[in-house]
Regions:
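Conserved ABC ATPase "signature" region
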Residues: 98, 113-131
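ABC ATPase nucleotide-binding domains
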Residues: 235-256
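Helix-to-loop junction immediately C-terminal to a conserved catalytic motif
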Residues: 50
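Conserved ABC transporter NBD signature motif
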Residues: 58-69, 75
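Catalytic Walker B motif of ABC-type/P-loop ATPase nucleotide-binding domains
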Residues: 160-164
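Conserved ABC ATPase signature
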Residues: 110, 135-139, 143
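The feature captures the beta-strand-to-loop junction immediately N-terminal to the Walker
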Residues: 35-37
C-alpha cells in the first residue's frame, strides 16, 4: 500500500517544465531513496510532496489526503521534512527538539505531559539526552543533524522526508545519520523518503530506490534489481557492481 502518490503531475519553474505527467508511488512503512544527477528534480519532488510547491497539473496525495487541500498544520501532522540547508537556531538542543511538537498544539499553547514525554523519547532515541541543554550552534555537524532528526521524531508524523541528510558530514557521521533514518522505519513504523546523493548509502540503507534523470523516473525497485542498477549506470554514466554483506545489506562499487 502506498503512503504517497503522485498522479500525472506536471510542474516547473517559470517557463521551464521539470515534470510532465510524472506518476510515482512510495510504499508505506519502507525507506525509499531518490537518487539522480544534480538538477533532475529530486528536491523539487519532495517540495511537491510536502506542499511547499503545488503542481501545475495532477495530484499529490499523502495517506489518501490531497496535499494541496490541506492546511499547513494539517500537512505538519501528516508529514515532516528535514530540508537540505538549515542553520542551527539560537536555542538549546532540547528547545530545538521541542519545536517538533508545535503542530500538535500551536506555538503559544502550553505543552502537556505527552509533549514532554515525546521530546525526551526523541532525545534518547538520537543519543542526545546528555547534550540536551547545550546550545545547538555548538554541536558538531553530525550532532546537529541528529538534533534535527530528533525534532522530526518528536513531531511524530507517519511520513518523514529528508533532503540530502548526509551532505557536508564526515564518513562516520553519514553512517550515524543513515542508521537513525533507518530506525525511524524499523523502530517507529515511519514511512521514510530521502533524497540521497551517495549511491552506496542509498543502496545500502534503502528498501527501495527511485532513479531519476531530467525530471523522469527511470526505475524504481529494490537495490538488488537489475533494472534499478541499470538505471543507476545510465543516470550517472558509471559502472556499478553490487556486493552483498553478511547481514544482507548491499554495497555498491562504481567506476567510470
Amino acid at each position: 500500500m502506498a503512503s504517497i502518490q503522485l498522479s500525472d503531475v506536471s510542474f516547473g519553474y517559470g517557463e521551464h517544465v521539470l515534470f510532465s505527467g510524472l506518476s510515482i508511488e512510495f510504499a508505506r512503512g519502507k525507506v525509499t531513496s531518490i537518487i539522480g544527477p544534480n538538477g533532475c528534480g529530486k528536491s523539487s519532488l519532495l517540495k511537491l510532496v510536502s506542499g511547499i510547491c503545488k503542481p501545475w497539473e495532477g495530484t499529490v496525495r499523502v495517506l489518501g489526503h490531497d496535499v494541496a487541500a490541506l492546511s499547513s498544520k494539517g500537512r505538519a501532522r501528516l508529514l515532516s521534512l528535514l530540508a537540505q540547508e538549515h542553520a542551527a537556531p539560537p536555542m538549546s538542543v532540547r528547545q530545538l527538539v521541542t519545536c517538533g511538537r508545535y503542530p500538535h498544539h500551536g506555538m503559544l499553547a502550553a505543552m502537556d505531559a505527552a509533549d514532554y514525554e515525546a521530546v525526551e523519547r526523541a532525545l534518547a532515541a538520537c543519543g542526545l539526552s546528555n547534550l540536551a541543554e547545550r546550545p545547538a550552534a555548538e554541536l558538531s555537524g553530525g550532532q546537529r543533524q541528529r538534533a534535527f532528526i530528533a525534532m522530526v521524531l518528536a513531531q511524530d508524523t507517519p511520513v518523514v522526508l529528508f533532503d540530502e541528510p548526509t551532505s557536508f558530514l564526515d564518513v562516520s557521521a553519514c553512517y550515524d545519520v543513515m542508521e537513525l533514518m533507518r530506525s525511524l522505519k524499523e523502530e517507529h513504523g515511519k514511512t521514510v523518503v530521502a533524497v540521497i546523493h551517495d549511491i552506496d548509502l542509498a543502496l545500502r540503507y534503502s528498501d527501495e530506490v527511485c532513479v531519476m534523470r531530467d525530471g523522469k523516473l527511470l526505475a524504481q525497485g529494490t537495490p538488488q534489481e537489475a533494472e534499478v542498477l541499470a538505471a543507476v549506470e545510465d543516470a550517472f554514466d558509471v559502472r556499478v557492481e553490487l556486493l552483498h554483506g553478511e547481514l544482507g545489506n548491499s554495497y555498491a562499487l562504481w567506476r567510470r
